[in-house]
A protein has these predicted regions:
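Small-residue-rich anion-binding loops in enzyme active sites
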Residues: 47-62, 127
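Amphipathic alpha-helical interaction elements
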Residues: 51, 64-67, 195-196
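Metal-dependent phosphoesterase signature
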Residues: 58-94
């Protein structure tokens, strides 16, 4: 069986890891509390930028601490109910066309993201895709802000793809992978048909050097 593995933020959608949390907080907090939270978040941005440059896995772990204390069920239900309002309009039209092409070929569609599962699950349901995503630890009905396991970034994302391929009898030499950043390189290198989508500078350089396909999706 052939599969198409898609990164989400920046590849399928014009989103980043911060946006879903910001949407949720704005919709569920009184205005003064939201502004207070936003101010604290802004204070963390320099540290996040340094961490992201050093190791994106470190950044992801740091950022997900922002979920600490949030009611888990409320967050899951809100993201499911508000998919159309906040997320659907940010899906690239070209990405939808490509997913449809893969479906017509009989390929299995798989979303692979360093984001958390309940945020991306509505997108996976809408596209009819399997989902490989991070999970947040829960305690007494609230998120602790800690990931279960290692972030699905870099080699972690590639390992998840290899495990999925082994379980589902996927022929990786004939399969496809789509990503937008250097951290997606290990996943892209797993398949016979890697595609750099709206690539950042470092991924573009690697894609050109390795002869990978480069596309711009809107």
């Amino acid at each position: 069986m052939v599969a198409a593995f898609f990164d989400v933020d920046g590849t399928l959608t014009a989103t980043n890891v911060l946006m879903p949390l910001a949407w949720f907080m704005k919709a569920n907090l009184p205005k003064w509390r939201y502004l207070l939270w936003l101010g604290k978040l802004v204070c963390h941005i320099p540290a996040y930028l340094v961490a992201d440059r050093f190791d994106r896995r470190v950044f992801v772990k740091m950022f997900f601490r922002q979920y600490e204390g949030i009611d888990a069920e409320r967050a899951k239900v809100w993201h499911q109910e508000n998919f159309e309002a906040f997320f659907k309009s940010r899906i690239y039209a070209d990405a939808v066309k490509q997913i449809q092409w893969h479906r017509e070929q009989g390929h299995k569609i798989v979303l692979v993201t360093g984001g958390v599962d309940f945020v991306v699950k509505p997108l996976a349901d809408w596209t009819g895709a399997d989902l490989i995503a991070g999970r947040l630890e829960e305690m007494d009905g609230k998120f602790t802000g800690r990931l279960i396991g290692e972030p699905l970034i870099g080699d972690g994302k590639a390992k998840a793809v290899l495990a999925y391929a082994d379980e589902h009898k996927i022929d990786l030499t004939k399969s496809y992978a789509y990503g937008d950043s250097k951290s997606d390189v290990p996943m892209l290198a797993c398949v016979g048909n890697p595609v750099a989508v709206n690539p950042d500078r470092r991924l573009r350089q690697i894609a050109i050097k390795r002869g990978w396909k480069i596309v711009q999706w809107r």
